[in-house]
Amino acid sequence: MNDFLTVKVDSKISGVLSFEENEYIFSYKTEDKKDFISLTMPVRTKSWNSKNLHPLFEMHLPEGYLLSIIKKHFSKFTKTDDFGLLKLMSPSIKGRVSYEQDLKVELKPLVLDDLLHSSNEKLFDELVSRFALNSPISGVQPKVLAQIENKATLKLEDYIVKSWGEEYPELALNEYLCMRVVQKANICVPEFYLSQDRKLFIMKRFDIKEDNTYLGFEDMCVLFGKNRDDKYEGTYEQIAKTIKTFVSPKYKKESLENFFKMIVINFLLKNGDAHLKNFGLIYDDISNIKLAPAYDVVTTTVYIKNDIPALHLLGSKKWWKEKQLLRFGIEFCDLTVKEVSELYSLCVRAKDEIIEEAKIYKNDEHLSEFIDNLIGKWS
């Protein structure tokens, strides 16, 4: 295989990524400043060189469960190092940044109602066998990216379908209830569902516009210039600073308010996996950059009793209470005393409302202990 990929932005050739003498080299082939591949890699004559795969490209690589499945099936036939994986996945990578390919991937779409109401015990395994190679999404949780028909809208749209293993019981329900808290706190979230058998959490991609063109999306690993192995290295203060650096003036206040609420909820719900890859920015051009919707929120302490926050806050990885969280909002999110107090109260009310919603699941005797445990973790 040739060790290069032609990179496109909004379907136009932007540059070439190559791997030469153990170095990754990206060279722009355009002079149009709008065709930048990353907010941190503007168009320029000089190439962008790196010993590791550039974080923007690495963002497209699978991790954990998906990575193990792909390596198991394809390591006999092709290299499965970072560049080999990117080449393998590139035909299915759709977004503002994509790759020129001769091969066109066509897969029969699924129907949303069928996923939500299926009684097939092996459904997720079947989804993996069909969609694993077409799922350029990061994260260690078992998940695939699938095209699904929504009968309500009659549209074919991309959804992320997540499942869970025996070591993380009821993870789909956990994430669903946590995301309901986020939604109740008036934070922008993607469309999401829980299947009737609670085996699947299904979330719509949030970087696709109504006209089926794509928004740019970059997670904080990309914006920090870090590789995925460093996603637990950093602070929430640094994320706030990055928001202030990159977000457009007209969206800055709203983005900082939402980020503050995200942090409050992650602490209230004891989400120890709110790392750099679980926050990001979206944009359609350089003048319209804002905080991405919230995603991947779970109560990790249900499974890891003594889990701690993913990143440092106020110099420590501990579950700070109201006083310290309000201080964070004032000092680093540029909010007033009145604003942080009101936003914090909104998050607490959202959590309390969803606790009442969660209690409905206690009618199922198999869920009663799990729900009690989950609610007990929510401070």
Label each region the model flagged:
Residues 1-272, 276, 280-379:
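Phosphate/dinucleotide-binding and metal-coordinating scaffold of catalytic cores
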